[in-house]
Amino acid sequence: MGKAIVLDTSALIMGYETTEVEAEHYTVPSVREEIHRDDIRKLRLDNAINSGHITVRSPDPKYRGETQRVIGEMGEADALSEADAELLALGAQLKGEGWETTVVSDDYSVQNVASELGLGFKGLATQGIKRQFRWETYCPGCRRTFEDPQEDGVCPICGTDLKRRPSRKRPLRT
């Protein structure tokens, strides 16, 4: 196919110009909802959508499920919003449809998961990640680690606030 660029809220807030890049541009409904809280940016986004420069598209459930699985395996579930997960799922779907897909986001967790999904990524205000991380949740009090994030962020054993740390670092997938 061609090139597809998936835009995160941060890209739209930073003023990413869709007319400067030869590619199809996409975003997801939840990003559009986040932008609609700001009048000026809402107007710019609506103009880009109405003029055909940006397409708003929801990912298929198959890609949502696969992306949620990867997010969980990487320990990024607490760091990513529903909009982030939806955006990454759309990127995975576009890649599956044959597009050369790049996610534009300054969020390091989005970039981390995009790398694992085999998507390109680019930041506007940041250089982007240099290595890929898998995260684990741990208790600094009793030193236990947890596979799944605890809902309240508190250790069920000793009551200490839980923290995240990298459990594995590796070079980026290319």
Language-model features, listed with the residues they occupy:
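Short metal-coordination and nucleic-acid-contact micro-motifs, chiefly zinc-binding Cys/His arrays
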Residues: 132-135, 151
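Short hydrophobic/aromatic-enriched beta-strand-loop microsegments
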Residues: 24-31, 119-131
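Active-site-proximal, substrate-binding regions of enzyme catalytic domains
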Residues: 2-95, 99-100, 108, 116, ...
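Hydrophobic beta-strand scaffold residues
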Residues: 101-103, 121
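Long, charge-rich boundary regions
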Residues: 166-174
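Short linker/helix segments within small regulatory modules
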Residues: 147-154
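Short cysteine-rich clusters marking metal-coordination/redox-active sites
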Residues: 138-142, 155-158
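Short Cys/His-rich micro-motifs in 6-15 aa windows
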Residues: 158-167
